[in-house]
């Protein structure tokens, strides 16, 4: 019984990671762009690689965080992009490493890219920055340092 639990637990965790629910059902890049325009929501392109330890960690912690996940489901269209398989899209966005988060506005205009692993508490602030369109008023670092008022 103990051996079965030891074998079953890692298998369940791996299946959960592979089946991580995309908050908005976008089948491909063009579909995600159309969905973002239709719903007037920003688009998050999340580039990952199955062989990337930081990607696995980001999905296990940051993207699995209840607060982050709730914001993504409610306020964003999300497209997970396997950088190893979607080479055209990876080239288009000049992805040189994973994980990488590209944020686009509802019209598809590129806002900014954040490469690397990001902790959940910081990712929530970044999502708020994009959701609230604070990028039109201040740069991201000021928002992170001073908040939405900039003071």
Task: Pin down the residues of each PLM region.
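Structural micro-motif
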Residues: 42, 93-102
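Local sequence-structure signature of Cys/Sec-based thiol-disulfide redox active-site neighborhoods
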Residues: 31-64
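N-terminal leader/targeting and pre-domain segments
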Residues: 24-39, 132-136, 141-151
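Thiol-based oxidoreductase modules, predominantly thioredoxin-like and allied folds used
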Residues: 65-87
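Bacterial N-terminal signal peptides that target proteins for export
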Residues: 2-12
């Amino acid at each position: 019984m103990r051996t079965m639990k030891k074998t079953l637990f890692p298998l369940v965790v791996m299946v959960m990671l592979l089946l991580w629910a995309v908050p908005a059902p976008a089948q491909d890049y063009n579909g995600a762009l159309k969905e973002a325009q239709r719903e007037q929501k920003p688009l998050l392109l999340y580039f990952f690689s199955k062989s990337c330890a930081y990607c696995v960690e980001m999905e296990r912690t940051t993207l699995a965080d209840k607060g982050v996940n709730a914001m993504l489901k409610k306020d964003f269209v999300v497209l997970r992009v396997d950088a190893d398989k979607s080479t055209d899209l990876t080239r288009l966005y000049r992805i040189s490493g994973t994980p990488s988060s590209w944020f686009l506005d509802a019209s598809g205009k590129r806002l900014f890219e954040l490469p690397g692993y990001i902790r959940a508490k910081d990712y929530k602030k970044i999502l708020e920055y994009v959701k609230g369109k604070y990028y039109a008023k201040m740069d991201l670092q000021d928002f992170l340092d001073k908040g939405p008022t900039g003071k």
